[in-house]
Amino acid sequence: DRDILDNTKYFWSTVGTAGNRVTTWAGFAAAPQRLMEMAVPEGDTHAVMTPNDGYGLAGAFTGTYVQDIARPAIERAKLPSLPGMAAAYMSNNLPVVTAGTRVLADGLTNGASQTSNWADVRTTFKQDLICDDFAASATFKAGDVFTLSGVYAVNPVLSGDGTTTLKPNYSYLQQFVVLEDKQADGAGAVTLSISPPLITSGPYQTCYNSNANTDGLTITFVGAASAIMPVNAAFHRNAIAFVTRPLEMPAGVTDCARETYKGISLRMTPVWDGISSVQNWRFDIIYGTQMIDGRLGTRFFGA
């Protein structure tokens, strides 16, 4: 699961306060609430938490008066079925994002026309963002999340009200995630690869810019400089792909087997050790993981 979960650091949506432990239902509920605001389909959404946060949340249910919830929470730290989630799990293989040396609010965007057209980014869903005014040689890490002043999140489903084609915006700022490690030059300038792209109109609008253009917007990051932030994530099953393919069967080897079940293909090959007179079995799989739709998930911290 480590390879699959490592993709969760590329979710740009983040709720809660960076570094805070999840210890209350309200702290956890911010995640399914955000998924609903992002129009993520219900039914196949799951939450995965670090043991520290999972046990913290389990403690929130020990005082309930429903025996089927309180007893497992006390005896096995088992999480009940949670509204908005098909299931909630704990894993010690979630990624840990170590923030860059950038400070919380330091840099500015540098360029008046830094928006994207859907047709140009539809296969990558990313863009470059030219920035300046950072500290010299400041670093930015893949998984760093930030907002731009005056750039708000939008309801991805609703269209305009008849007087405008713009989607209605929420009261909170749109978040963006850094996709690649970068370092500012000696003058504090850097070009960041980010997702989602800034699409400010049309059916695939990702944000609403209340500013005249995209120049000089304050960049505010989630988490302090060099902060260590374990990732909790809630997401739809279609957000991340796990792909395998059947391996070729070796020629001249008997008793080989290959089986594909629910899209996962495994090959078994007998290996005879003639020196030690031992029969061994080799199991092989080839696979890859990939974030395929960052719109279908969110990271979360405690309140």
Model-derived regions: residue spans:
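Core alpha/beta structural scaffold of self-assembling particle/tube/pore-forming proteins
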Residues: 1-303
